[in-house]
């Protein structure tokens, strides 16, 4: 059997909730590893039985995380995306990807 893809969730608002529920219920071959970001991260992590990381840095340091979903407010995504990419993790960034074309270009 192939290994399951470990997913980290950054963001605990409506879209963080939606994406995490989708990963848990509908993404075959993937599992939620941890959640960080936002005032509801702890509650959302508890709901899914995963840890709530204290920071993006703590999350991306986890070797069991292969990919990260970024579901944060638009203005936060550039810095987060750069940290996740620097850690060598795959990314799914919510739309709009960035607030400017220059930021989006940096993210690529």
Predicted regions and their residues:
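N-terminal Rossmann-like dinucleotide-binding module
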Residues: 1-47
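Beta-loop-alpha module in the N-terminal Rossmann-like domain of NAD(P)-dependent dehydrogenases
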Residues: 48-108
